[in-house]
């Protein structure tokens, strides 16, 4: 089984390779489409606190949210102080109070963390009872997912992430 990009691993250049892919036309097109979709969802969600865990490119996915308290949590130290990073965290133990977030956004994070089930349990812990989870990910049964399998591009970002089916 190919190795996943571990965005929480500072010792590798996996995160940098993923950012390079996102700067290419196909990556930019994907980011733009996801920004549009998320921009249609977030304004409909109300609350006091919205949290984006991880980043997937240069776009501000939270800009369309009406929620005023916006937090980005990264698993790697911020290299750029102007990046908007407000919180560093660990994927297996989020430093956020239980039942404190109204909305959590996970842009392709589950595909690249070492323990996605643990992260989902942590997200469930921090969400309020009627909170919302907004997730993005690659569909393994889409054309891109099948292309990945046929060409065995599993060693190159973003294709070396673990793609989860919608039914899962």
Which sequence ranges carry the predicted segments?
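Class I SAM-dependent methyltransferase Rossmann-like catalytic core
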Residues: 1-44
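Class I SAM-dependent methyltransferase SAM/SAH-binding core
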Residues: 36, 40-94
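A short glycine-rich, Lys/Arg-flanked "PGG" loop and its adjoining helix->strand segment in the class I
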Residues: 117-132
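A short SAM/SAH-binding and catalytic strip from SAM-dependent methyltransferases
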Residues: 102-117
């Amino acid at each position: 089984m190919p190795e996943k990009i571990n965005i929480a691993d500072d010792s590798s250049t996996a995160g940098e390779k993923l950012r390079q892919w996102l700067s290419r036309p196909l990556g930019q097109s994907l980011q733009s489409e996801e920004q549009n979709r998320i921009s249609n969802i977030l304004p409909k969600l109300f609350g006091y606190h919205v949290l984006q865990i991880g980043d997937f490119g240069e776009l501000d996915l939270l800009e369309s949210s009406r929620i005023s308290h916006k937090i980005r949590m990264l698993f790697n130290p911020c290299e750029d102080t102007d990046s908007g990073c407000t919180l560093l965290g660990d994927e297996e133990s989020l430093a956020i109070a239980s039942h404190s977030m109204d909305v959590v956004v996970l842009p392709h994070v589950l595909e690249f963390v070492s323990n996605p089930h643990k992260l989902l349990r942590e997200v469930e812990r921090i969400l309020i009872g009627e909170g919302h989870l907004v997730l993005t990910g690659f569909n393994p049964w889409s054309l891109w997912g099948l292309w990945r399998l046929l060409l065995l591009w599993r060693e190159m970002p973003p294709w070396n992430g673990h793609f989860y089916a919608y039914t899962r």
